[in-house]
Amino acid sequence: MIRYCKIKHCIIGFDRPKICVPLVGRSAEEIIAQADQIRQSQRSSAIDMVELRGDYLDILPDYEVLDRLLAKVAEILPEKVLLFTIRSEAEGGEKLAFTTPTIYEINRHVIEKATADMVDIELFSGAEQAEEMIGIAKEKGVKIIMSNHDFQTTPDASTIVNLSLIHISEPTRPE
């Protein structure tokens, strides 16, 4: 079964693999400079999305600054899908002092404000919390990526499917 997801001009699950470039910096200024660099790049048209890595930011959990930063990145790169990610240390994220509840609250804020097109939620962050965020995301039009980073092994396909918290509906063709 093939499932498509359309965000802005980008159709995920259709055509070619998508190119996502991370925005990684400690400050809002560093992130904005990287977004400007992408915009000015001759290869900018090949980039489908940018991933703002919140686990590197020193500004968190200052929601006001985060909201302005996400809005500025979206303004600089209006054609790019904006993915927001806070990766926990256990799954390869930067070693900042974010507890699982803090990561949940930050992700929930971004989803409720719809300041990003997509938010990455770690599969094992808690089923109840993940389901709650997925429900809010559907209401707000924010797409969710459920991720799991196992650095020891790659599970077989049936295990990956069984880990899913979401029952995927019938496939759809992109518009």
PLM features: residue spans?
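Solvent-exposed alpha-helices and their adjacent loops that cap or buttress functional pockets
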Residues: 11-14, 111-113, 165
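Redox- and metal-dependent alpha/beta enzyme cores, enriched for Fe-S-associated oxidoreductases
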Residues: 127-140, 146-165
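A structural micro-motif
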Residues: 17, 80-81, 142
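Active-site beta->alpha loop and helix N-cap motifs at the rims of alpha/beta catalytic domains
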Residues: 21-41, 47-132, 152
